[in-house]
Amino acid sequence: MSNLNVERVLSVHHWNDTLFSFKTTRNPSLRFENGQFVMIGLEVDGRPLMRAYSIASPNYEEHLEFFSIKVQNGPLTSRLQHLKEGDELMVSRKPTGTLVTSDLLPGKHLYMLSTGTGLAPFMSLIQDPEVYERFEKVVLIHGVRQVNELAYQQFITEHLPQSEYFGEAVKEKLIYYPTVTRESFHNQGRLTDLMRSGKLFEDIGLPPINPQDDRAMICGSPSMLDESCEVLDGFGLKISPRMGEPGDYLIERAFVEK
């Protein structure tokens, strides 16, 4: 257990019946890059039951934040969803992950493609001033089935632009594009279809993705990752083959290989 820190739950927010987020204390020894994940868990039958979770908070915050689905029969999530303020949670001491901007080649525009709780690592990254220094536009696309699954929408549209540190950069550079597949909404459709048809680019006022200018990061379900990779490959982008070797786009490999 020496590779784990015990943290305390500071707050829990239930977005709807299937999604929740929670904040915990952060051991000062934990250092991570925005976009990385840690293993978190609870003690079950005397042993730690751990799962990989992206850190949704930026690395300069004193707390940690996580974003999760509720799975009624999931070994860990069935328990995590009942967390309350003051409860203890185990967090691994070794963050890792492939969604780090240092593994992207230089470019003008950064596309963050997410579905569901795949938004989590990008919540960390859109609060990173360095991301805005590196790119002229940062496009955050969040695909969900129902409107009430658009977690953090108000935070992204109202709170972030008011940041005293990088609010001006957010106003100038961040394009937030939520899209819904099973209800009426001002943006509708799967993000891969919106990219293929060109509607996404018309809506945001940028040219279609090309390998000279555009970089991307993807986090979502295995099928969404496969399809998004196919679309980006079709635009001529090349994936980063492994950690430490830059490419035009990145996927979170850990969640794929499970």
From Swiss-Prot:
Pfam families referenced in this protein's UniProt entry, alphabetically: FAD_binding_6 (PF00970), NAD_binding_1 (PF00175)
Induction info: Overexpressed under N(2)-fixing conditions.
Assigned keywords, A-Z: FAD, Flavoprotein, NADP, Nucleotide-binding, Oxidoreductase
Annotated NADP(+) binding sites: D17, V144, R145, T181, R182, R190
Top-level taxon of origin: Bacteria
Catalyzed reactions: 2 reduced [2Fe-2S]-[ferredoxin] + NADP(+) + H(+) = 2 oxidized [2Fe-2S]-[ferredoxin] + NADPH
Keyword Flavoprotein: yes
InterPro entries: Cbr1-like_FAD-bd_dom, FAD-bd_FR_type, Flavoprot_Pyr_Nucl_cyt_Rdtase, FNR_bac, FNR_nucleotide-bd, FNR_type-1, OxRdtase_FAD/NAD-bd, Riboflavin_synthase-like_b-brl
Annotated FAD binding sites: 51-54, 67-69, 74-77, 117, 254-258
EC number: 1.18.1.2
Gene Ontology molecular function terms on file: ferredoxin-NADP+ reductase activity; nucleotide binding
Enzyme class, first EC level, given as a word: oxidoreductase
GO biological process: cellular response to oxidative stress; heme catabolic process
Boundaries of every FAD-binding FR-type domain copy: 2-102
Cofactor(s), names only, from the UniProt record: FAD
Protein biosynthesis as UniProt keyword: no
Family, as annotated: Belongs to the ferredoxin--NADP reductase type 1 family.
Record text on subunit structure and interactions: Monomer.
Function according to Swiss-Prot or TrEMBL: Transports electrons between ferredoxin and NADPH.
Name of this protein: Ferredoxin--NADP reductase
Originating species: Azotobacter vinelandii
Primary gene name: fpr
